[in-house]
């Protein structure tokens, strides 16, 4: 069933496989007229179908299931047993079909093309926003085979001291010779994402950045080589952090998360984490974004790959690139 605002119902009729009788609409009187709320209409629907005494699963940690939604359900359905479904749909998406893998491969090609544009475009004196304009053009233009879509996260572009922070976006400031820039982006095909990140160095890089980037790539490669069905997320993490330990590099944040379908504000699936102690077993066609964010006070480097669990892995990682 699809429960949707009347103004947006056309999207459900056009974009889904649902029969019309399974699309339930509510009108404008429920929109932003507190205390009236769309869930008042949802409660009426549940009562009409005699579901008000059943177990009702809700996604307690969903981006769009608010505290007010929850309170409405509790008040309107006092005899129902409302339970956290604990990311039920997310876990159902965890293992991809071959068709889904096909979409992600197409998204990967778009990511590669857009990153190439980023590498060719970023230069001293250019505004960050102008570079992102070219990157976004490439992401939407896609490939001759398939066009792109908007990503769940906009292109990220921390620059200079900003490389020591995460998830910064472009400004109208200009790129500076001698500084590094991190580019994180994703191609999208039928809402399937395949993100990647690279570090661009303008001018001659400092030795500490070269060393950090080499260690980052080595750690990523070690983790990727451990990405095989039957291994756990912890196995991948142990290989990754084993390399960092060798170079005495400290990293507290996770280094990967499952990916697939995504809508704003996130392209992660909120299931698997590549982190020590996550014992989730990798199955064939499990996909995750393995992202190595290395931050060292006032500077940082980063590289990432989208990885698929198969019986073999082979991937050549980049190095920090002078432009």
Q: What positions do the PLM features span?
A:
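Active-site neighborhoods and metal-handling regions in enzymes and metal-associated proteins
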Residues: 1-317
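Conserved AMP-binding A3 loop
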Residues: 320
């Amino acid at each position: 069933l699809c429960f949707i605002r009347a103004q947006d119902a056309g999207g459900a009729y056009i974009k889904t496989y649902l029969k019309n009788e399974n699309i339930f609409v509510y009108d404008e009187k429920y929109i932003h007229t507190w205390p009236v709320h769309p869930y008042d209409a949802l409660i009426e629907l549940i009562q009409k179908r005699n579901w008000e005494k059943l177990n009702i699963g809700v996604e307690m940690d969903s981006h769009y299931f608010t505290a007010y939604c929850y309170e409405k359900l509790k008040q309107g359905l006092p005899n129902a047993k409302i339970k956290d479904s604990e990311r039920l749909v997310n876990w159902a998406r965890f293992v991809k079909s071959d068709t889904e893998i096909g979409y992600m491969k197409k998204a990967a090609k778009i990511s590669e093309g857009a990153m190439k544009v980023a590498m060719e475009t970023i230069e001293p004196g250019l505004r960050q926003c102008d570079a992102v304009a070219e990157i976004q053009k490439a992401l939407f233009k896609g490939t001759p085979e398939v066009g792109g879509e908007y990503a769940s996260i906009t292109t990220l572009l921390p620059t200079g001291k900003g490389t020591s922070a995460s998830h910064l976006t472009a400004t109208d400031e200009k790129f500076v010779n001698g500084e590094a820039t991190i580019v994180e982006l994703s191609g999208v095909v039928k809402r399937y994402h395949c993100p990647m990140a690279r570090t661009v160095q303008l001018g001659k890089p400092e030795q500490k950045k070269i060393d950090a980037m080499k260690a980052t790539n080595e750690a990523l490669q070690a983790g990727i080589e451990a990405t095989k069905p039957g291994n756990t997320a912890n196995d991948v993490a142990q290989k990754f952090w084993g390399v960092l330990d060798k170079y005495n590099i400290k990293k507290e944040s996770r280094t990967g998360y499952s990916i697939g379908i995504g809508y704003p504000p996130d392209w992660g699936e909120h299931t698997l984490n590549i982190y020590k102690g996550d014992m989730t077993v990798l199955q064939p066609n499990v996909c995750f974004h393995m992202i190595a964010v290395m931050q060292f006070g006032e500077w940082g480097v980063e590289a990432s790959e989208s990885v698929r669990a198969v019986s073999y892995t082979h991937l050549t990682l980049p190095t920090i690139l002078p432009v």
